[in-house]
């Protein structure tokens, strides 16, 4: 994604499906799409989470997240590899929050995220889908989140998306929790600590959906 990438369609789900077809990554550049690459990203988020809260708070949450994630990745390594072969690991957006989506007439514009988040952009397409779904849900737009999910499935014809989506919802919730902690420190806004914990608890909830 480049700054102000335009999608000539009022539906982000349809536009994303088209963009991802053009931006799938060759296997040699798709290491982060492998189970072990994704595992490392999740471990990094869990480690960063421990930096911001007392162990008595984080340890139970980390346990609820880490064990289901590890079991899922051990059992589904072939699913991650299959998605690389099928071109589902893409040069995505990396931070597909509603604030980066702008509708102008018949065009949906996706503005690029901050440079720091671009290192998270080469991932399974499920990452961007999960990010937008999560943000819509936490902002009270559950129906719109599910509508986007169903439309993306229809357009992308991604039969394995729902098998891997809970893992990326877990990861997205972790990342948003860490980002909120960073904002809390930068702004000295203690109330953001509560918001961050809500994201971490969401990550624990999504991890229970892993099979």
Predicted features by range, described:
Residues 1-23:
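Single conserved hydrophobic/aromatic residue that forms the stacking wall/gate
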Residues 8, 14, 28-35, 139:
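Short, polar/flexible loop-turn hinges at active-site or ligand-entry regions and domain interfaces
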Residues 21-64, 84, 88-89, 163-170:
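A cross-family kinase active-site recognition segment
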Residues 36, 60, 117-123, 136-139, ...:
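Alpha-helix capping and helix-loop boundary segments enriched in small/acidic/polar residues
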Residues 51-91, 198-210:
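An alpha-helical support segment within catalytic cores of ATP-dependent transferases
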Residues 77-125, 211:
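Active-site acidic catalytic loop and adjacent metal/ATP-binding pocket
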């Amino acid at each position: 994604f480049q700054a102000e990438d335009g999608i000539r369609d009022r539906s982000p789900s349809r536009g994303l499906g088209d963009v991802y077809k053009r931006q799938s990554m060759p296997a040699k550049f798709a290491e982060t799409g492998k189970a072990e690459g994704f595992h490392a990203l999740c471990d990094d988020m869990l480690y960063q989470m421990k930096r911001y809260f007392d162990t008595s708070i984080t340890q139970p949450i980390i346990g609820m997240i880490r064990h289901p994630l590890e079991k899922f990745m051990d059992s589904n390594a072939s699913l991650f590899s299959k998605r690389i072969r099928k071109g589902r690991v893409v040069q995505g957006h990396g931070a597909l929050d509603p604030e980066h989506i702008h509708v102008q007439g018949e065009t949906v514009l996706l503005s690029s995220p901050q440079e720091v988040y671009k290192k998270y952009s080469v991932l399974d397409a499920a990452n961007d889908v999960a990010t937008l779904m999560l943000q819509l849900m936490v902002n009270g737009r559950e129906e719109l989140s599910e509508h986007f999910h169903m439309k993306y499935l229809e357009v992308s014809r991604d039969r394995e998306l729902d098998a891997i989506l809970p893992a990326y919802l877990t990861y997205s919730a972790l990342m948003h929790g860490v980002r909120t902690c960073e904002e809390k420190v930068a702004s000295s806004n203690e109330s953001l600590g509560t918001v961050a914990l809500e994201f971490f608890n969401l990550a624990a909830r999504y991890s229970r959906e892993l099979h």
